[in-house]
Amino acid sequence: MNYNVLLSDQVQVAGAIDPDAYTAATYTTGWISMATYNRIMAIVMAGTLGSSATLDAKLEKATDGSGTGAADITSKAITQLTQAGTDSDKQAIINCRSDELGGAFTHVRLSMTVGTATSDAGAIVLGALARFEPATDAT
């Protein structure tokens, strides 16, 4: 390990869903090329969840940056956060390696769904182990 390398040269912001009060709907990051990173980590952040609200998040894959052939990535979703389950102000993480996409899939994005009631939430996707360093932030 090289202790002279900045952590920000090894881990970059690859995508984000800006923190906000979101109505019941689905929100996504842009498509992220896994040709850039060996791994990504999506961090989903729940703020104050509205009455009876739910928060779901998952990773999706596609064959290009426009979302062609979009599909869910197996086992790449959080356990649903709920207001009833006292999950306000909690975080959840989804990890993904480039070799987990399979087939001709080359891109990923994070999809976050707020259900039932307006809720505070946000997410960030970090790209790590860039194939060419130092990588730069996508956002």
Segments and roles (model prediction):
Residues G47-T54, T116-D120:
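Extended, low-complexity, turn-rich repeat/linker tracts enriched in Gly/Pro/Ser/Thr and Asp/Glu
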Residues Y37, S52-T54, F105:
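Extracellular Ig-like/FN3 beta-sandwich strand-entry sites
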Residues A21-T28, D64, L81, A92:
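N-terminal low-complexity, charged segments
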Residues W31-S33, A77-T118, A123-A128:
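Beta-sandwich interaction modules
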Residues M1-A35:
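Solvent-exposed, flexible loop/coil segments flanking beta-strands in beta-rich domains
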